[in-house]
Amino acid sequence: MDFSFSDDQRLIRDTVREFMEAEVRPTIRERDREGKFSADELRKLGEMGCCGMLVPEEWGGAGADTISYVLMLEEVARIDAAMAVALSVTNSVIAMPLLKHGSESQLKKYLPRLARGETLGAFCLTEPQAGSDASAIATRAVRHGSVYRLNGTKSWVTNGGHAGVYIIFAKTDPAAGSKGVSAFLVEPSFPGFRVARFEDKMGLRTSHSAELSLVDCEVPEENRLGDEGHGLRVAFEGLDGGRIGIGAQGVGIAQGALEASAAYAKQRRAFGKTIGEFQAIQWMLADMQTEIEAARCLVQHAAWLRDSGARTIGPHSARAKLYSSEMVNRVVAKAVQIHGSQGFSRESDVERMYRDARVLTTYEGTSEIQRMVIARDLLGQTRERADSRGAEPVAAGAAASPRAGERFTGGR
């Protein structure tokens, strides 16, 4: 097994790191304090290809592999976790579903703009009464001639208010349950679309989360993404890839916290020596680094499987997201402890990292949902099992998932 990176992968990692250190780190505390959206910084990252990492060059993207993508996200999250999630959403749950399910006209209209970073995308599944239970959404889409009229409310929309295209999920056939949900490409200029409010969040404050109001929002029939009733398939396939991105985000935050803690331990003195000379601090740092490396391996393995054309990545991305999101919360807690009172101050980077990390166990599937996905796959594999050492996994039988839309069913 080769754990080395190609020259292109190292170049992407190093270029993004240099940009983040020079352009983003100097302003992150101020932007976090003010809750200022990182529009200029995201535009520059888009010009570098970070908004369309996985999009083929023919559509304006970088045409990079998933390993390069997670390396990019880790470097961004190491300094600004909120910026990383804005990029993850545009890449994983907007561009990829559009690339797979979009018509030729939809691809031409939206994909190059997304890939070049000229606009961001937003994924609109969650509603006030429907989080983990996606089939419980209440937003309706009713056809009137050549348009659909959407009515409902979408909540916790990352990039909401800043995106140029929204994938909105609505019920076209309420009687069909999970098979009655369809996906639509919605522009903020469409009649009936309104950003109702922005959330005042504990963390990820430089990435805005909005509530959307849809009142007879008119969406042309040609803006339906995929077939009627296939909306949750579109959503879950996107989330399979998105969870790899969130795993990378967790690794990046944790790496930033580790570096800050190690530097502090080498300069902070107590009882006549640096605190890094005490075994208690050394063991905390050692545990932090070990957990980060374990999470990094899970994330990069899931990314490698995706690049290898594996028939299913859902359980792998769920494991990566589960472990990384819980790992980073343990790591940032240790980082605050190592910093002592300084770690409780807004002047400390680890204070922000502590707040930013908390949501990772919630969005793009809670830890509890990840465990359900993992266990369902494990218990349903009654024939052939995935080779845990890296061979291409064989898709589980139907019993592995009672909702087929939760399984990854194809490549890009």
Predicted regions located by residue number:
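A short, Trp-centered hydrophobic/proline-enriched beta-strand micro-motif
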Residues: G117-L125
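Short glycine/proline-enriched turns and hinge-like loops at secondary-structure junctions
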Residues: A64-D65, D133-S135, N159-G164, G177-G180, ...
